Amino acid sequence: MGDQVLGAHFLEDALKLFRDYKKLAEGAFAQVDDHDLFRAIDDESNTIAVNMKHMAGNMLSRWTDFLTSDGEKANRERDMEFVMLPETTRADMVEFWERGWRCLFAAVEPLTADDLMRIVKIRGQDHTVVQAINRQIAHYAYHVGQIVYLAKHFKSSRWQTLSVPKNRSAEFNKFLEEKVKSGTSAAAGRFDVGQEFAAKNRK
């Protein structure tokens, strides 16, 4: 396998991961009402809205002029990403969330295999493009996990699972095996098959 093929595969998979985590977070925060979107479980915890705000702020800093400027922008106010103004609405948060993701995809989608070993800086430290992308995938997965956990906590028994339901692994494996045999699983997102199985069993 040549470097070009490997590089193209990496970028394709990275974009897929970004889209999958975006969709997972949205499936979680769509289930909570406005009160729970802005509610913290204790004084040290972030709310769902704060996680959204921080992720979007990070994206706007990291991915604006990705190849040509430091990923930690001088005009970024990181500490304010963890402060929620009283007048902030769900619509405000969703708009900012989408703005961050648009910035990310605008930066990553044009990349080619030839870009992957280029050097970019984050807080003055050198990263290859591969390292910078992997760093952000890990960071966003961390915060998406918090969003899912909080939404699940608030919804409790009314939570509609976004993965394989508890005590249904054997059934899910059979369901997935049948999808693989039929050739319909390959195009699904990383979390889509589990959600499809859960939805099928709610009917």
Predicted feature residues:
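Hydrophobic alpha-helical core bundles mediating ligand binding, dimerization, or RNAP-core interactions
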Residues: 18, 22, 29, 97, ...
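Acidic-glycine-rich active-site phosphate/pyrophosphate-binding loop
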Residues: 30, 114-121
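Helix-adjacent hinge/juxtasegments
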Residues: 65, 70-107
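Extreme N-terminal tail/first-helix region
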Residues: 1-16
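Short, contiguous alpha-helical
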Residues: 15-19, 26, 34-81, 122-185, ...
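Short amphipathic alpha-helical segments with heptad-repeat character
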Residues: 12-15, 19, 91-94, 98, ...
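Long, charge-rich low-complexity segments
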Residues: 99-116, 183-203
